Amino acid sequence: MIRDSSTLQKGQNLRVEVNEVRDRLPQNILEIIKKEPVVELVGYKMVDGNQFGLVVKLTNGDINWFFEKELSEIM
């Protein structure tokens, strides 16, 4: 879980927490993430007026977004 996304930089690699997204993603995207959960941060998205989503690029080149609680930093 990312606690403060303001410290992240575009191009930074993050890990998708598969257990956090299992219920909301289509099966084809879930399979991609299960094989390779590391994604690249490409931007931010306002999602509900007071929360930001993190826009990421998957290993197959697709763009998707996740909440901070669904990602973690790779140290």
Segments from the language model and where they lie:
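Basic/aromatic-rich interaction segments and small domains that mediate binding to polyanionic partners
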Residues: 1-75
